[in-house]
Amino acid sequence: MNIFLKVFLMFILSSVTFGAENRIDLDLRLEPKNEKNFYLLKGSFINKKVILFEGNTYKIVRSQNELFVDEYYDTVLQSLFNKKASLRYRKRFVDGVDSKNLIQFKTQIDNVKIIGMNEFKIEINSGDTFVTYRDFKNYINRSKNKNSELYKQLRSYVNISKLEPMFLVTQHRDRFYLQDNDGKTIYTISFDEVIYSKQLLKKTYFVIEFETNETIMASADKITSDALVKSLNEFVLNLDEGNVLFNRTYDSKYAVGIKKLGIEPKTENIIEIILIFFALFSIILLFCVPMFYRIKVNHKM
């Protein structure tokens, strides 16, 4: 239908930083049933120096005062949302200082089973600043970025020229790193206080994310990665047996934002029907107007 439609419309109109990274982002998320539960769990981690995790002892290292400002992009048809993917421009601040800017593209590894996300990144050069969406678009279309894995993957999901800003997200993050005896971070637990914004509408959201180290997951063999996933899953389940204080969620922050802000995704079929109707109406006008004119002239004669 798409090919037919394009040809059809053409007929009517003629008549009238390099350095992207590929990682596996595996996280488990809990939504607190109320704000109190969120802060109670965070407090329990603040007061601990070490934690026993599936028979292993990990040192807890806290990182706080992180602020993320994210702008999400998609097409008018919300093609990325429908394909369980997301694209964002992220600015990261630590203690109020801009520390890192990057573009992130995430895709679900399996469309049926939720087993993690593929993550592709392009780090923004310190000298580059985005004031408008056009700046973002120009940057991602630079020659060096077109050779990145992010660009190649994104292009396979969506027509990049059709991307538009969807909404803004600000989130305050308190993060706890679980490190082994060698000082290597194996797991990360993040407490996120999120505000979704679109025009004058604002919605709050609290979520706790439990993640394995992205780099370790990307390089690990299947046995090791399965063991890490199993340990993390059991740890999260034991935190709240019976889901008394929290609900397990599988929605990405982008999907949550779409729902909380009430942005209804459009479907290609509806758009195509409208365009086809317009095309047919134009065809009728092209053929009927001359016909009526000839009839009128003949009638006068």
Q: For each of these PLM feature ranges, what is it?
A:
Residues 2, 14, 91-95:
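Solvent-exposed, well-ordered amphipathic alpha-helical segments
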Residues 2-10:
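Sec-dependent signal peptide recognition
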Residues 10-18:
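Hydrophobic h-region of N-terminal signal peptides that target proteins for export
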